[in-house]
C-alpha cells in the first residue's frame, strides 16, 4: 500500500442456490487466488454464501445455521493471508433475520453490517424475509468472539492511514440518502457494496451512473460486487456486473453475463488529497462510529491500473473535440468580457509562428466575432529578430492574412542592437541578457501599439511555461489579458489542430498544420543553416513530462517519489527512469525558483481543474524553499 495504492477486487463466483458448502468452497478459492495476486481487499456479492434467490428458504433454520458455519470457515481461511474479504449472508440477531455483509480478516470475523434499506417493490420482496438494520453498533457472539454488528463501522489498518473501509448493501445505494454518504463523512475512503441487481434492459447504464456518481460525490473508491450466474432464473437473471470506481471514473469493470473477478489499485492518497482541497467536504465527528482494526501489511503494490501520460488531454476523439470547443469558448468569452468592459477599440497580439501566439490569435478572432467587431481591429504584430527563421516568419504572415486581421511588421534588430550599445552588452555573447532584451523589446512594442490604437495586449504564454518560469519577466510574461494562462502546452497542440480541422480556408488549414509541425522555440538565438537552433524541449525538457508532473503536483499534491513512480508506468517504453528523474528534478527546481513570475500574473481565464493564478488556485510564497522536495529527489 505504498503511496496510498491498495489493490482491490470485486468477485462473482459460481454458486448453487442454498448450497452453502459449494458456495463457500468457491469463495475461499477466490480469496486464496486473490491473495496470491497481492490483492488486499476483495468484495463478493450480496448473500453470496447462500445465494440471493433462496426465497422462503431463508426462513429455514438449517440454511441460516449453515451460512453462519460457512462464515466461520471463510474467516478461518484468511488466517495466514494478507487480505480482507467482504461476504454476504443471512444472519439472525436477537431473533430477527438480517441481510448482512461480513468483513473477515486475519482469521477473524471483524464486523457484520446489516442492510438498511429493504426493497419491497416490483420484483423485490425482501421484506418478506429480512428486517432493516440499524446504524447503531451492538455486538453479537460468533464462535466465542464478540463481533460488532451495525452499519456504522469503519474498518481501518495501521498499514495505511488512508485505508478506511465501510459497507453498504445493494438497495442502500439506490436510495435518496445512501448510508455511504455518512460513512464517507465519517472518514471512509472505500465503500464496498454487496449487490444482487438483476438485469433488465438498460439497467446496467443506470447502475454505472450510480456507482460513478457516488464515488465522485464522496471522493471515494467504490467497489461494487454483483450477483451472477448460479442465482435462480425462475423469474430473474443476474449478470455479475462488477465495478471498481474512483472519484467518478470506472477503473475496472467485468464483462456482464460472465462470473468474473476484476481488480485494480485504488489511489487512497489521491482521494484524501481531493478531500483536503475541498473545504465543503466536511469530515464530521465519528463518535457514532465504531472503528475496527484490520491486520494488513504495507507492501509495495505494483501499479497495473491505467496511468494517462497526457492527463490534460482526453484520449477519446469525440470527447477531445467537445473539450476543445469548450476551452476555446471559455477563453474567448473571458476575453470578450474584458474587451467589452474596457471599451477597447483593438486587440494587439504578437505573432511568432509558434503554437502559443497562434492559439491566442484564434481566441481573439472568436471574441471579436462574438462582439460583431471587424477583425481588422485585431492587430497582429510580427517582430522578427536574430533568431527568426523564414519558416516561422512566413507562417506568422500567412496565418494573420488568412484570418483577415491587420498585420503589422516591426523588425526589432536595430532597436535591440541600439539597446545593447546603450547597456554596453556584446551582441556576440548569447546569454540571458541577449535573449531577454529581445523579449522585452517585443513587449514594449506591443504595449505601445495597444496604447496608440486604444487596445489591449493579449498575452500568449501558456500554463506549462508559467509553471517552469519559461518566460521573460516583464517581457512575454506580461500582457493586459492572458488568454492561454490556464492551458497547458500539451493541450494547446490539440486546440490548434481542432481549429485546423474545422476550417474551410485552405491557406489557414495548411498554415496551422505547418505550425503544428514546427519545433517549439522562443527563437532568441540565431538559426543554424536557416533552421531553428534553440529548441525549448532540449533545454527545459519534454513538455509531456512537465505537464504530467504539473498535473500530479497540483491536482493531488503528490510527492516526487510518487510522481516518478506514476510517470514510469505512464511513459513505459518512451522514457526510462533516469530520463524521467532528470527532468523531474528540473521541474521542481524551476517550479519553486520561478514562483515570483506567477505571483504577478495578468488576469486570464481558468479553463481546467489545474490553474496557477495567484488570485485563485495557487497561492505560494515567491521565496519558499524547496529543500525537502530536493532532498527526496536525491534519494530516488
How would you label these PLM feature ranges?
Residues 1-348, 366-375, 407:
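Enzyme catalytic cores with a strong preference for nitrogen-chemistry domains
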Amino acid at each position: 500500500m505504498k503511496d496510498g495504492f491498495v489493490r482491490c477486487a470485486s468477485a462473482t463466483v459460481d454458486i448453487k442456490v442454498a448450497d452453502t458448502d459449494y458456495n463457500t468452497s468457491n469463495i475461499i478459492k477466490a480469496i486464496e487466488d486473490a491473495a496470491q495476486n497481492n490483492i488486499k481487499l476483495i468484495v463478493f456479492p450480496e448473500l453470496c454464501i447462500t445465494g440471493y434467490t433462496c426465497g422462503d428458504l431463508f426462513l429455514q433454520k438449517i440454511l441460516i445455521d449453515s451460512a453462519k458455519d460457512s462464515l466461520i470457515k471463510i474467516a478461518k481461511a484468511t488466517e495466514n493471508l494478507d487480505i480482507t474479504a467482504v461476504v454476504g449472508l443471512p444472519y439472525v440477531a436477537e431473533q430477527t433475520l438480517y441481510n448482512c455483509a461480513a468483513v473477515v480478516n486475519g482469521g477473524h470475523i471483524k464486523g457484520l453490517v446489516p442492510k438498511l434499506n429493504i426493497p419491497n417493490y416490483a420484483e423485490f420482496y425482501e421484506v418478506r424475509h429480512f428486517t432493516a438494520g440499524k446504524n447503531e453498533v451492538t455486538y453479537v457472539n460468533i464462535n466465542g468472539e464478540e463481533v460488532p454488528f451495525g452499519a456504522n463501522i469503519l474498518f481501518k489498518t495501521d498499514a495505511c492511514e488512508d485505508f478506511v473501509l465501510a459497507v453498504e448493501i445493494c438497495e442502500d445505494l439506490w436510495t435518496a440518502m445512501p448510508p455511504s454518504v455518512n460513512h464517507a463523512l465519517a472518514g471512509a475512503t472505500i465503500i464496498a457494496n454487496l449487490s444482487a441487481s438483476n438485469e433488465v434492459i438498460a439497467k446496467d447504464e443506470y447502475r454505472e451512473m450510480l456507482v460513478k456518481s457516488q464515488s465522485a460525490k464522496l471522493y471515494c473508491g467504490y467497489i461494487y460486487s454483483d450477483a451472477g450466474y448460479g442465482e435462480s432464473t425462475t423469474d430473474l437473471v443476474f449478470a455479475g456486473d462488477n465495478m471498481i470506481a474512483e472519484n467518478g471514473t470506472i477503473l475496472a469493470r467485468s464483462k456482464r453475463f460472465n462470473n468474473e473477478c476484476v481488480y485494480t489499485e485504488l489511489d487512497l492518497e489521491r482521494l484524501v488529497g481531493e478531500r483536503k482541497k475541498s473545504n465543503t467536504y466536511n469530515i464530521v465527528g465519528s463518535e457514532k462510529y465504531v472503528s475496527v482494526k484490520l491486520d494488513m501489511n504495507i507492501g509495495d503494490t505494483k501499479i497495473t491500473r491505467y496511468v494517462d501520460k497526457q492527463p490534460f488531454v482526453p484520449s477519446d476523439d469525440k470527447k477531445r473535440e467537445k473539450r476543445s470547443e469548450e476551452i476555446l469558448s471559455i477563453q474567448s468569452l473571458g476575453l470578450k468580457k474584458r474587451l467589452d468592459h474596457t471599451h477597447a477599440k483593438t486587440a494587439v497580439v504578437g505573432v511568432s509562428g509558434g503554437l502559443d501566439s497562434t492559439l491566442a490569435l484564434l481566441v481573439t478572432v472568436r471574441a471579436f466575432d462574438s462582439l460583431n467587431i471587424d477583425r481588422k481591429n485585431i492587430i497582429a504584430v510580427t517582430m522578427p529578430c536574430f533568431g527568426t527563421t523564414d519558416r516561422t516568419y512566413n507562417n506568422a504572415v500567412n496565418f494573420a492574412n488568412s484570418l483577415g486581421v491587420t498585420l503589422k511588421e516591426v523588425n526589432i534588430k536595430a532597436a535591440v542592437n541600439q539597446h545593447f550599445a546603450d547597456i554596453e552588452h556584446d551582441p556576440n555573447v548569447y546569454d540571458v541578457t541577449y535573449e531577454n532584451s529581445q523579449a522585452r523589446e517585443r513587449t514594449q512594442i506591443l504595449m505601445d501599439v495597444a496604447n496608440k490604437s486604444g487596445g489591449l495586449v493579449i498575452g500568449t504564454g501558456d500554463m506549462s511555461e508559467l509553471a517552469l518560469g519559461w518566460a521573460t519577466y516583464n517581457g512575454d510574461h506580461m500582457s493586459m489579458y492572458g488568454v492561454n494562462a490556464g492551458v497547458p502546452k500539451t493541450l494547446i497542440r490539440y486546440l490548434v489542430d481542432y481549429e485546423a480541422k474545422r476550417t474551410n480556408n485552405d491557406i489557414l488549414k495548411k498554415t496551422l498544420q505547418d505550425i503544428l509541425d514546427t519545433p517549439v522555440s522562443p527563437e532568441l538565438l540565431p538559426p543554424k543553416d536557416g533552421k531553428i537552433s534553440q529548441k525549448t524541449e532540449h533545454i527545459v525538457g519534454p513538455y509531456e513530462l512537465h505537464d504530467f508532473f504539473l498535473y500530479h503536483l497540483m491536482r493531488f499534491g503528490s510527492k516526487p517519489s510518487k510522481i516518478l513512480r506514476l510517470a514510469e508506468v505512464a511513459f513505459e517504453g518512451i522514457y526510462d527512469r533516469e530520463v524521467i528523474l532528470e527532468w523531474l528534478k528540473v521541474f521542481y527546481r524551476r517550479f519553486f525558483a520561478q514562483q515570483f513570475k506567477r505571483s504577478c500574473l495578468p488576469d486570464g481565464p481558468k479553463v481546467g481543474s489545474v490553474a496557477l493564478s495567484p488570485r485563485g488556485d495557487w497561492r505560494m510564497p515567491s521565496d519558499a524553499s524547496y529543500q525537502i522536495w530536493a532532498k527526496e529527489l536525491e534519494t530516488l
